[in-house]
């Protein structure tokens, strides 16, 4: 099984790491091409390009100037312990037993506007560059187009015939994958909550649930669709009436 998730805007470079293990990102050559473009942007340009405040633009301009390779444990940090958003709250990687890290490393991939595709223990430096950013790179009109061939080829290389491919990323990030070119079908779980008597997808809960689904897969060694349907963390249950084919809906 392979799983893809989105990165997070929030980063944590302070928390003590539970392991000294790390790996090298696969696409630093391509990341340097993207970085060269974004490094040239002034704070005001970053603010407009990313629709962020002047304060955030200044922070990310500084990050862009300081970003450099090679990555080492002294100047970079494993991705799964660095991203700090709702998905990562649900995943709670810090409490995954170290003997399960190899399972996480094998199954999980993180889509990224700067790094393309990251393994959990891949080193990364601080950045902010969402996949939907309308920024031409090399011959590509945007980041989706730049990364799509590389990311899709990498996933196909890793996916074995008959293996499940679970999409827990946002639409913005998953659009960097050429679904038609994948050699296996895509399983897409969705998570909905009852609120005021109506079933809704509430962003915070849905993002956290995506992370919890990754954790469930790691905890239970899930391999089949039936295994996925057993997801029951924090009150979610599989809803057979709302689900159809490879679209799995969980409600609570």
Q: What are the language-model segments listed below?
A:
Residues 93-243:
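Internal, well-folded beta-alpha domain core
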Residues 2-6, 164-167:
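Short hydrophobic beta-strand segments
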Residues 243-252:
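Extended, charged low-complexity segments
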Residues 3, 86, 187, 248:
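A broad, low-specificity signal marking well-ordered, structured residues that form hydrophobic/aromatic
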Residues 4-95:
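Active-site helix-to-loop segments that bind/position phosphate- or nucleotide-bearing substrates
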């Amino acid at each position: 099984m392979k799983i893809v998730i989105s990165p997070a805007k929030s980063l944590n470079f302070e928390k003590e790491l539970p392991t000294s293990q790390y790996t090298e990102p696969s696409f630093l050559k391509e990341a340097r091409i993207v970085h060269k473009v974004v490094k040239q942007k002034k704070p005001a340009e970053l603010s407009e390009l990313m629709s962020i405040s002047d304060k955030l633009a200044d922070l990310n301009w500084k990050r862009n100037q300081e970003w450099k390779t090679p990555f080492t444990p002294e100047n970079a940090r494993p991705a799964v312990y660095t991203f700090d958003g709702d998905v990562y709250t649900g995943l709670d990687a810090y409490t995954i037993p170290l003997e399960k890290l190899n399972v996480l490393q094998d199954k999980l991939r993180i889509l990224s506007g700067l790094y393309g595709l990251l393994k959990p223990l891949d080193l990364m430096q601080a950045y902010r560059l969402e996949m939907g950013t309308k920024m031409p790179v090399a011959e590509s009109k945007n980041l989706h187009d730049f990364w799509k061939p590389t990311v899709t080829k990498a996933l196909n290389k890793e996916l074995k015939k008959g293996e499940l491919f679970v999409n827990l990323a946002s639409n913005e990030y998953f659009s960097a994958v050429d679904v038609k070119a994948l050699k296996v079908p895509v399983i897409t779980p969705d998570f909905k909550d009852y609120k005021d008597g109506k079933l809704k997808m509430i962003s915070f809960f849905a993002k956290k649930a995506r992370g919890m689904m990754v954790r469930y897969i790691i905890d239970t060694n899930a391999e089949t669709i039936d295994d996925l349907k057993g997801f029951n963390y924090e009150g979610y249950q599989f809803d057979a009436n709302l689900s159809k084919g490879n679209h799995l809906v969980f409600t609570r």
